[in-house]
């Protein structure tokens, strides 16, 4: 750069600093670039698929899927992991449906959890913004976008048509929230529901969409699509769901990774089940017929018994997890081939 341009830039920078404060504009090389902090999800498979060891702090995350697919369970497990590390968690329950007993079973310290059950969408988002600006919250969950009902809709008649009201509310709120979220280093998770687009018949185009307009799709650094794909049985009794989680957007690591995990009723994501599956894949756990073995020791006949053995021997589970973390680097997880992309994967 020639001297005249340097002087002009120096004058401009000093004027900006005088008007807007020190640090308003800086050279990237002037500050140390730190790795993004992450909060574990409670699923080792998902943490590795996300590429940074969990969900990123200081960012917006969207988790969406059909009903009863495990969205709230996943967020409650992330809250539990955050609390274990001494973090503070808040839950904005716009659906008025949080079960504290179930949350406790997943490891959430319910006594320390900040809970709000707002009356309107504006109130929910204002409370969220105030908590974020306090700089004291490590993780916040808003459940759900679909339940953030604008005040005008609540005060109006049942059949009133108010097109685009919720989308405008979300767009305005995210414009305000995003900067505060970054400054306070808070992880904010929006749970969202699916709706069907009317008249979408184009081949290869998904008729599904999320509620609340397009703003959240753009502001979110990570978007997770979570779906139930099967049942887990113990004899004739169904004890949980087999669940597929797909990373459809990731600004911090390669996207489109996906994992298939187990969510057990009353327990949440099966840590031991994941360890067994990943152990077999990594050839750390041997499977001969119905028997599973680890380190030359038989750990159970059938997956359910092997899961129980690891639960009763936490030191063995911890050793297997350490071996798996060493074996599976985030870059080694490959995208599963042949899967259909769903719900605007390019967003």
UniProtKB/Swiss-Prot annotation:
SUPFAM superfamilies per the UniProt record, alphabetical: P-loop containing nucleoside triphosphate hydrolases, RecA protein, C-terminal domain
Taxon lineage: Bacteria, Pseudomonadati, Pseudomonadota, Gammaproteobacteria, Lysobacterales
UniProt function note: Can catalyze the hydrolysis of ATP in the presence of single-stranded DNA, the ATP-dependent uptake of single-stranded DNA by duplex DNA, and the ATP-dependent hybridization of homologous single-stranded DNAs. It interacts with LexA causing its activation and leading to its autocatalytic cleavage.
Keywords: ATP-binding, Cytoplasm, DNA damage, DNA recombination, DNA repair, DNA-binding, Nucleotide-binding, SOS response
Protein name: Protein RecA
Residues annotated as signal peptide: none
Pfam families in UniProt: RecA, RecA_C
Basic and acidic residues: compositionally biased ranges: 327-336
Disulfide bond positions: none
Subcellular localization: Cytoplasm
Start-end of Acidic residues biased regions: 337-347
Biological process according to GO: DNA recombination; DNA repair; SOS response
Similarity comment: family membership: Belongs to the RecA family.
GO cellular component, one term: cytosol
Residues annotated as transmembrane: none
Annotated region described as Disordered, given as residue ranges: 327-347
Listed SMART domains: AAA
């Amino acid at each position: 750069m020639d001297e005249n341009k340097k002087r002009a830039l120096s004058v401009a920078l000093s004027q900006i600093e005088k008007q807007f404060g020190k640090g308003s504009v800086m050279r990237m090389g002037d500050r140390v670039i730190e790795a993004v902090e992450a909060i574990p999800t409670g699923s080792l498979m998902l943490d590795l698929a996300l590429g940074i060891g969990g969900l990123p702090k200081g960012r917006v995350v969207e988790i969406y899927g059909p009903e009863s697919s495990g969205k709230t369970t996943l967020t409650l497990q992330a809250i539990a992991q955050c609390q274990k590390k001494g973090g503070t968690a808040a839950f904005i329950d716009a659906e008025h449906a949080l079960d504290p007993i179930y949350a406790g079973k997943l490891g959430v310290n319910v006594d320390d959890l900040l809970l709000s059950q707002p009356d309107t969408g504006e109130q929910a988002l204002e409370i969220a913004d105030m908590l974020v600006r306090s700089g004291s919250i490590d993780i916040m969950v808003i459940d759900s976008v679909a339940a953030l009902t604008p005040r005008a809709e609540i005060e109006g008649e049942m059949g009133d048509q108010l097109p685009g009201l919720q989308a405008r509310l979300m767009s305005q709120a995210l414009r305000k929230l995003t900067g505060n979220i970054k400054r306070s280093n808070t992880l904010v998770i929006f749970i969202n529901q699916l709706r069907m687009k009317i008249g979408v018949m184009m081949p290869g185009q998904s008729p599904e969409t999320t509620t609340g307009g397009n703003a959240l799709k753009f502001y979110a650094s990570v978007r997770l699509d979570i779906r139930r794909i099967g049942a887990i049985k113990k004899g004739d009794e169904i004890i949980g769901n087999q669940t597929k989680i797909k990373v459809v957007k990731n600004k911090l690591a390669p996207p489109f990774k996906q994992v298939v995990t187990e969510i057990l009723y009353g327990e949440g994501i099966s840590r031991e089940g994941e360890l067994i599956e990943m152990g077999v894949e990594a050839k750390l756990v041997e499977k001969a017929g119905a028997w599973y073995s680890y380190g030359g020791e038989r750990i159970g006949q059938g997956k359910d018994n092997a899961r129980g053995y690891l639960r009763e021997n936490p030191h063995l589970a911890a050793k297997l997890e350490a071996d798996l973390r060493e074996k599976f680097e985030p870059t080694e997880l490959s995208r599963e081939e042949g899967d259909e992309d769903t719900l605007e994967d390019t967003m």
